[in-house]
Amino acid sequence: RRAADQGHRVVLVFGTRGEMGEVQDGFLADGEPLWQRRVAETLASAEILGAARVEFLPYIDSGMMGEPSNEDPACFWQAPVEDAARQLADLLVQESADVLTVYDDNGGYGHPDHIQVHRVGARAAELAGTPGVFEATMNRDDIIRSMRESSEYLTEEQRAEMPDLEGEDAQNFGVD
């Protein structure tokens, strides 16, 4: 909100509509698709942030890393970086953008679409000549602490899928 309040034009661009997210029973109205809820939430958030424009690139959500949905040719993860970057670069040029924010190269927590945001955003900024590119990152220690604290609420199957938070996995968590 600060940027808009300081007179900057804020534009939000999303790679997908988040249609692959997990949904708890009763969260959506009968027949309501998740993407529709996500778009409504996005637009409401954009208004709170004072965003002047919201755009969605024409890709579908890739789901979490390692899921079969990662292989869908229409998903953002599978989009050729150059093609997606040109679409974003066109928006950056239209807006005369001075700054672009992207995820870090690990996509925050390793989500394939967030990793792709990093790749596409970095290339788009080059193509558009956008001078400032800032990466949003997450503190590894905070992530590990949160995972430890929340593990007691997971099923055995879910715990088995978690990285080893005491050994080498913890030292290298989020680092390629």
Regions found by a protein language model. Give the residues of each.
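Metal-dependent de-N-acetylase/amidase catalytic core
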Residues: 2, 69-74, 78-176
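Active-site rim/loop-helix segments in enzyme catalytic domains that contact anionic ligands
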Residues: 1-96, 122-127
